[in-house]
Amino acid sequence: MAVKTGIAIGLNKGKKVTQMTPAPKISYKKGAASNRTKFVRSLVREIAGLSPYERRLIDLIRNSGEKRARKVAKKRLGSFTRAKAKVEEMNNIIAASRRH
């Protein structure tokens, strides 16, 4: 909508007012992890290690490429989008282990 002109006729007729910009809704934050949640998850990952299917994914990525790993991850996780994210996470773990 265009800015009002302050005159009574024309396409943009009406009183000039400053438009209110409401704060974003709290519900828009759904799915974004808080700092505490990130910390707790990293701590659990450090203590508990990888689950068996994650170890298998890493093995598949190293040996037979990502396509097979994605298929296994999709079977385990249910959706292809989550499978791609998990394979990407496992790639990051492999890269981190190479660095150290």
From Swiss-Prot:
GO biological process: cytoplasmic translation
Stored Pfam families: Ribosomal_L36e (PF01158)
Superkingdom: Eukaryota
Keywords for this protein: Cytoplasm, Ribonucleoprotein, Ribosomal protein
InterPro entries named in the record: Ribosomal_eL36, Ribosomal_eL36_sf
Subcellular location: Cytoplasm
Gene Ontology cellular component annotations, sorted alphabetically: cytosol; cytosolic large ribosomal subunit
One GO MF term attached to the UniProt entry: structural constituent of ribosome
Family: Belongs to the eukaryotic ribosomal protein eL36 family.
Assembly notes: Component of the large ribosomal subunit (LSU). Mature yeast ribosomes consist of a small (40S) and a large (60S) subunit. The 40S small subunit contains 1 molecule of ribosomal RNA (18S rRNA) and 33 different proteins (encoded by 57 genes). The large 60S subunit contains 3 rRNA molecules (25S, 5.8S and 5S rRNA) and 46 different proteins (encoded by 81 genes).
Note: Present with 5370 molecules/cell in log phase SD medium. There are 2 genes for eL36 in yeast.
Function per UniProt: Component of the ribosome, a large ribonucleoprotein complex responsible for the synthesis of proteins in the cell. The small ribosomal subunit (SSU) binds messenger RNAs (mRNAs) and translates the encoded message by selecting cognate aminoacyl-transfer RNA (tRNA) molecules. The large subunit (LSU) contains the ribosomal catalytic site termed the peptidyl transferase center (PTC), which catalyzes the formation of peptide bonds, thereby polymerizing the amino acids delivered by tRNAs into a polypeptide chain.
Protein name stated in the entry: Large ribosomal subunit protein eL36B
Source species of the chain: Saccharomyces cerevisiae (strain ATCC 204508 / S288c)
